[in-house]
Amino acid sequence: MPCSYKAMLKTLFAAPLTGLLGYFLLSSQAQAAISIDGVLDEPEWAGAELYTEFVTVEPLTGEQAKYPTEVRLISTAEGIFIGFTNYQPASIKRVNRQFPRDAEIEADRNVVSIDFDGTALAGYDFTVGSANSQQDGIVTPGNYSADWDGIWYSQTSSEADYWYSEIHIPWTVAPMTNSP
């Protein structure tokens, strides 16, 4: 199902995301010994900030997600590390296809949107499909542009009842007025 960017824009710019950037700057500070290999097995992940409460955004119902997702966040001098554990019973078919870079990912995926400056003027969107397809873009009030190609890293892996996506977004990926 195609992503509804209008819904995302409305949600993204409903309020400034200064809290999100502040979170990244104050989150689990670690020395980067994380290998982006699609497996969250490094000791740093055990001490990462953990988020587990998510709602359905496609379709945009706001209801509690049907299957649990765990997101771990670590901030280092090199950037932000994000690890997703996406639980999905083996009995439920996964959409696990590879798509070209920046093509619409019509598969199971994780999306991270960050307003690095906390101004609600520009957000950076990073999407990883379950087969490690990547899509990124810039979100501004009323617009989404996939013309931007940031340098960031991801890898995914899959088990019977869950799949991982592991992401590293370097601080240098976007201009910031207050870089860490």
Indicate where each model-derived feature is located.
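N-terminal secretory signal peptides that target proteins for export/translocation
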Residues: M1-A14
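Structural preference for beta-rich elements and adjacent junctions enriched in aromatics
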Residues: S27, Q31-P180
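Bacterial N-terminal signal peptides
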Residues: A14-S27
